[in-house]
A protein has these predicted regions:
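A Zn2+-metalloprotease active-site environment signal
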Residues: 2-287
Length: 287
Protein backbone atom coordinates (compact mmCIF):
# COMPACT_ATOMS: atom_id res chain seq x y z
CA UNK A 1 0.00 0.00 0.00
CA UNK A 2 2.74 2.43 0.70
CA UNK A 3 4.64 2.61 -2.52
CA UNK A 4 4.27 6.40 -2.14
CA UNK A 5 -1.59 18.34 -2.22
CA UNK A 6 -3.42 21.00 -1.18
CA UNK A 7 -6.62 21.50 -3.17
CA UNK A 8 -8.84 24.52 -2.67
CA UNK A 9 -11.74 22.30 -1.65
CA UNK A 10 -11.15 19.05 0.19
CA UNK A 11 -13.16 15.94 -0.59
CA UNK A 12 -13.21 15.22 3.12
CA UNK A 13 -12.81 17.42 6.13
CA UNK A 14 -12.03 16.32 9.69
CA UNK A 15 -15.06 15.37 11.67
CA UNK A 16 -13.65 16.86 14.91
CA UNK A 17 -11.54 15.50 17.38
CA UNK A 18 25.63 10.72 17.89
CA UNK A 19 28.53 13.14 17.97
CA UNK A 20 28.26 16.32 20.08
CA UNK A 21 27.54 18.59 17.11
CA UNK A 22 24.86 16.33 15.68
CA UNK A 23 23.33 15.84 19.13
CA UNK A 24 23.11 19.62 19.45
CA UNK A 25 21.26 19.87 16.13
CA UNK A 26 18.87 17.11 17.09
CA UNK A 27 18.13 18.88 20.34
CA UNK A 28 17.43 22.09 18.47
CA UNK A 29 15.17 20.32 16.01
CA UNK A 30 13.41 18.59 18.86
CA UNK A 31 12.72 21.91 20.50
CA UNK A 32 11.20 23.14 17.26
CA UNK A 33 8.78 20.22 17.06
CA UNK A 34 7.02 18.63 20.03
CA UNK A 35 7.68 14.95 20.70
CA UNK A 36 5.25 12.63 18.97
CA UNK A 37 4.41 9.86 21.38
CA UNK A 38 1.48 7.51 21.63
CA UNK A 39 -1.70 9.01 23.10
CA UNK A 40 -2.01 8.54 26.84
CA UNK A 41 -5.05 6.31 26.43
CA UNK A 42 -3.66 4.23 23.55
CA UNK A 43 -4.25 0.50 23.92
CA UNK A 44 -1.44 -0.59 21.58
CA UNK A 45 2.16 0.06 22.55
CA UNK A 46 4.26 1.67 19.80
CA UNK A 47 6.41 4.03 21.88
CA UNK A 48 7.60 7.44 20.69
CA UNK A 49 8.10 8.37 17.07
CA UNK A 50 11.63 8.63 15.67
CA UNK A 51 13.43 11.81 16.76
CA UNK A 52 15.18 11.87 13.36
CA UNK A 53 12.01 13.20 11.75
CA UNK A 54 12.60 16.54 13.49
CA UNK A 55 15.42 17.24 11.04
CA UNK A 56 12.87 17.67 8.23
CA UNK A 57 10.23 20.41 8.70
CA UNK A 58 6.76 18.85 8.91
CA UNK A 59 5.08 21.59 6.89
CA UNK A 60 7.55 21.12 4.04
CA UNK A 61 7.11 17.36 3.78
CA UNK A 62 3.33 17.79 3.97
CA UNK A 63 3.43 20.40 1.21
CA UNK A 64 5.49 17.99 -0.93
CA UNK A 65 2.90 15.30 -0.34
CA UNK A 66 0.06 17.61 -1.28
CA UNK A 67 1.84 18.59 -4.48
CA UNK A 68 2.59 15.05 -5.56
CA UNK A 69 -0.94 13.91 -4.71
CA UNK A 70 -2.33 16.63 -6.94
CA UNK A 71 -0.03 15.53 -9.78
CA UNK A 72 -1.11 11.92 -9.38
CA UNK A 73 -4.80 12.85 -9.52
CA UNK A 74 -4.19 15.00 -12.61
CA UNK A 75 -2.50 12.08 -14.36
CA UNK A 76 -5.36 9.75 -13.43
CA UNK A 77 -7.93 12.29 -14.59
CA UNK A 78 -6.16 12.66 -17.94
CA UNK A 79 -6.46 8.89 -18.43
CA UNK A 80 -10.12 8.85 -17.32
CA UNK A 81 -9.01 6.70 -14.38
CA UNK A 82 -10.10 9.00 -11.54
CA UNK A 83 -13.41 8.01 -9.97
CA UNK A 84 -16.10 10.68 -9.89
CA UNK A 85 -17.89 11.76 -6.74
CA UNK A 86 -20.89 9.57 -7.60
CA UNK A 87 -18.83 6.38 -7.84
CA UNK A 88 -20.23 3.88 -5.33
CA UNK A 89 -16.84 2.50 -4.31
CA UNK A 90 -15.46 6.00 -3.76
CA UNK A 91 -18.47 6.91 -1.64
CA UNK A 92 -17.85 3.76 0.39
CA UNK A 93 -14.21 4.70 0.94
CA UNK A 94 -15.12 8.22 2.00
CA UNK A 95 -17.75 6.97 4.43
CA UNK A 96 -15.17 4.68 6.07
CA UNK A 97 -12.67 7.55 6.24
CA UNK A 98 -15.24 9.79 7.92
CA UNK A 99 -15.46 7.24 10.72
CA UNK A 100 -11.67 6.93 11.12
CA UNK A 101 -10.60 10.57 10.91
CA UNK A 102 -12.07 11.71 14.27
CA UNK A 103 -9.62 9.36 16.02
CA UNK A 104 -6.53 10.62 14.18
CA UNK A 105 -5.70 13.78 16.14
CA UNK A 106 -4.62 12.07 19.40
CA UNK A 107 -1.88 10.39 17.38
CA UNK A 108 -0.70 13.65 15.79
CA UNK A 109 -2.04 17.10 16.68
CA UNK A 110 -1.09 18.40 13.21
CA UNK A 111 -3.83 16.18 11.79
CA UNK A 112 -6.39 18.65 13.13
CA UNK A 113 -5.32 21.07 10.38
CA UNK A 114 -4.96 18.55 7.57
CA UNK A 115 -7.35 18.81 4.64
CA UNK A 116 -8.19 15.15 4.50
CA UNK A 117 -9.02 13.79 1.07
CA UNK A 118 -9.88 10.36 -0.34
CA UNK A 119 -9.81 9.39 -4.01
CA UNK A 120 -10.11 6.21 -6.03
CA UNK A 121 -7.94 5.47 -9.08
CA UNK A 122 -8.77 2.86 -11.69
CA UNK A 123 -5.82 0.46 -11.77
CA UNK A 124 -5.23 -3.28 -11.37
CA UNK A 125 -2.58 -2.50 -8.77
CA UNK A 126 -3.23 -3.93 -5.33
CA UNK A 127 -2.28 -0.72 -3.58
CA UNK A 128 -3.34 2.21 -1.41
CA UNK A 129 -1.50 4.99 0.41
CA UNK A 130 -1.86 8.08 2.57
CA UNK A 131 0.46 10.99 1.81
CA UNK A 132 1.77 13.26 4.58
CA UNK A 133 -1.00 15.76 5.24
CA UNK A 134 -3.88 13.27 5.02
CA UNK A 135 -4.14 12.64 1.27
CA UNK A 136 -5.49 9.12 0.75
CA UNK A 137 -5.75 7.12 -2.48
CA UNK A 138 -6.97 3.61 -3.18
CA UNK A 139 -6.52 1.69 -6.41
CA UNK A 140 -9.50 -0.31 -7.66
CA UNK A 141 -7.34 -3.44 -7.80
CA UNK A 142 -7.11 -3.76 -4.03
CA UNK A 143 -10.89 -3.57 -3.65
CA UNK A 144 -11.82 -5.81 -6.57
CA UNK A 145 -9.12 -8.46 -6.51
CA UNK A 146 -9.18 -8.97 -2.75
CA UNK A 147 -12.95 -8.43 -2.44
CA UNK A 148 -12.45 -6.46 0.75
CA UNK A 149 -15.19 -6.09 3.33
CA UNK A 150 -15.74 -2.69 4.96
CA UNK A 151 -13.84 -3.91 8.03
CA UNK A 152 -10.88 -4.96 5.86
CA UNK A 153 -10.94 -1.66 3.96
CA UNK A 154 -10.82 0.11 7.33
CA UNK A 155 -7.73 -1.91 8.28
CA UNK A 156 -5.99 -0.90 5.05
CA UNK A 157 -7.00 2.73 5.44
CA UNK A 158 -6.10 2.84 9.14
CA UNK A 159 -2.68 1.39 8.35
CA UNK A 160 -2.03 4.01 5.67
CA UNK A 161 -3.29 6.84 7.87
CA UNK A 162 -0.98 5.60 10.62
CA UNK A 163 2.07 6.01 8.36
CA UNK A 164 1.11 9.68 7.90
CA UNK A 165 0.18 10.24 11.55
CA UNK A 166 3.42 8.70 12.83
CA UNK A 167 5.36 10.72 10.20
CA UNK A 168 7.22 7.72 8.83
CA UNK A 169 7.95 9.44 5.51
CA UNK A 170 9.42 12.42 7.32
CA UNK A 171 11.66 10.18 9.42
CA UNK A 172 12.75 8.09 6.44
CA UNK A 173 13.67 11.22 4.49
CA UNK A 174 15.82 12.42 7.36
CA UNK A 175 17.55 9.05 7.80
CA UNK A 176 18.19 8.49 4.10
CA UNK A 177 19.57 12.01 3.62
CA UNK A 178 22.79 11.10 5.44
CA UNK A 179 24.70 13.07 8.06
CA UNK A 180 25.71 15.88 5.72
CA UNK A 181 22.18 16.69 4.64
CA UNK A 182 20.91 16.25 8.20
CA UNK A 183 23.45 18.75 9.46
CA UNK A 184 22.43 21.12 6.67
CA UNK A 185 18.76 20.88 7.64
CA UNK A 186 19.66 21.34 11.29
CA UNK A 187 21.52 24.53 10.37
CA UNK A 188 18.51 25.73 8.42
CA UNK A 189 16.25 25.13 11.41
CA UNK A 190 18.63 27.26 13.43
CA UNK A 191 18.14 30.11 10.97
CA UNK A 192 21.41 29.58 9.11
CA UNK A 193 19.93 28.88 5.70
CA UNK A 194 16.84 28.28 3.63
CA UNK A 195 14.48 25.92 5.45
CA UNK A 196 13.08 22.83 3.82
CA UNK A 197 15.34 22.35 0.79
CA UNK A 198 15.41 18.59 1.28
CA UNK A 199 11.68 18.29 1.77
CA UNK A 200 11.02 20.46 -1.25
CA UNK A 201 13.11 18.10 -3.39
CA UNK A 202 11.57 15.01 -1.83
CA UNK A 203 8.13 15.18 -3.40
CA UNK A 204 8.90 12.80 -6.23
CA UNK A 205 10.12 10.19 -3.74
CA UNK A 206 7.04 9.99 -1.53
CA UNK A 207 5.01 7.72 -3.80
CA UNK A 208 7.79 5.09 -3.94
CA UNK A 209 9.11 5.44 -0.40
CA UNK A 210 9.72 2.13 1.34
CA UNK A 211 9.23 1.91 5.07
CA UNK A 212 11.12 -0.27 7.51
CA UNK A 213 9.67 -3.37 9.12
CA UNK A 214 9.35 -1.48 12.40
CA UNK A 215 7.42 1.27 10.57
CA UNK A 216 5.12 -1.36 9.09
CA UNK A 217 4.51 -3.00 12.46
CA UNK A 218 3.78 0.38 14.01
CA UNK A 219 1.35 1.23 11.22
CA UNK A 220 -0.36 -2.14 11.63
CA UNK A 221 -0.95 -1.55 15.33
CA UNK A 222 -1.94 2.12 15.18
CA UNK A 223 -4.23 1.34 12.25
CA UNK A 224 -5.74 -1.53 14.19
CA UNK A 225 -6.62 0.79 17.06
CA UNK A 226 -7.94 3.55 14.80
CA UNK A 227 -10.25 1.08 13.08
CA UNK A 228 -11.44 -0.50 16.33
CA UNK A 229 -12.28 2.89 17.83
CA UNK A 230 -14.27 3.64 14.67
CA UNK A 231 -16.33 0.46 15.11
CA UNK A 232 -14.58 -1.87 12.67
CA UNK A 233 -13.90 -5.47 13.67
CA UNK A 234 -10.21 -5.84 14.60
CA UNK A 235 -10.25 -9.49 13.50
CA UNK A 236 -10.47 -8.16 9.93
CA UNK A 237 -6.77 -7.27 10.19
CA UNK A 238 -5.95 -10.99 10.12
CA UNK A 239 -8.36 -11.85 7.31
CA UNK A 240 -6.92 -8.94 5.28
CA UNK A 241 -3.35 -10.23 5.47
CA UNK A 242 -4.46 -13.79 4.79
CA UNK A 243 -6.11 -12.50 1.61
CA UNK A 244 -2.96 -10.57 0.76
CA UNK A 245 -0.80 -13.67 1.20
CA UNK A 246 -3.14 -15.74 -0.99
CA UNK A 247 -3.16 -13.11 -3.73
CA UNK A 248 0.63 -12.92 -3.65
CA UNK A 249 0.93 -16.69 -4.00
CA UNK A 250 -1.57 -16.83 -6.87
CA UNK A 251 0.04 -13.95 -8.75
CA UNK A 252 3.65 -14.91 -8.15
CA UNK A 253 4.25 -12.03 -5.75
CA UNK A 254 2.73 -8.58 -5.34
CA UNK A 255 4.59 -5.29 -5.68
CA UNK A 256 2.47 -4.20 -2.73
CA UNK A 257 4.23 -6.71 -0.51
CA UNK A 258 7.64 -5.31 -1.42
CA UNK A 259 6.81 -2.48 0.95
CA UNK A 260 4.42 -4.42 3.17
CA UNK A 261 6.21 -7.61 4.23
CA UNK A 262 3.76 -10.38 4.98
CA UNK A 263 4.06 -13.64 6.83
CA UNK A 264 3.13 -15.43 10.01
CA UNK A 265 5.07 -13.01 12.21
CA UNK A 266 2.97 -10.06 11.06
CA UNK A 267 -0.28 -11.90 11.64
CA UNK A 268 0.95 -13.12 15.02
CA UNK A 269 1.63 -9.53 16.14
CA UNK A 270 -1.85 -8.47 15.06
CA UNK A 271 -3.46 -11.45 16.81
CA UNK A 272 -1.56 -10.59 20.01
CA UNK A 273 -2.91 -7.03 19.92
CA UNK A 274 -6.51 -7.72 18.94
CA UNK A 275 -7.54 -8.40 22.58
CA UNK A 276 -6.16 -4.98 23.54
CA UNK A 277 -8.61 -3.17 21.25
CA UNK A 278 -11.66 -5.45 21.31
CA UNK A 279 -13.31 -3.41 24.07
CA UNK A 280 -12.87 -0.27 21.95
CA UNK A 281 -14.62 -2.04 19.09
CA UNK A 282 -17.49 -3.24 21.29
CA UNK A 283 -17.98 0.20 22.81
CA UNK A 284 -18.02 1.80 19.37
CA UNK A 285 -20.60 -0.69 18.14
CA UNK A 286 -22.83 0.05 21.15
CA UNK A 287 -22.67 3.83 20.71
Amino acid sequence: MCTRCESSTSALSPASPWQPRRAFLLAAAGAATAALGAPALAQVNVGNASVARNLVPADKIEAAGVQQYGQLLAQARAKNALAGDNNAQLQRLRAIAQRLIPFATPWNTRAREWKWEVNLIGSKQINAFCMPGGKIAFFTGILEQLKLSDDEVAMVMGHEMAHALREHARARMAKSAGTGAALSIGAQLLGLGQVGDLAARAGTQLITLKFSRSDETEADLVGLELAARAGFDPKASVSLWNKMATASKNQGGLSFLSTHPSGTDRIAKLEANIPKVESLYRNAKRS
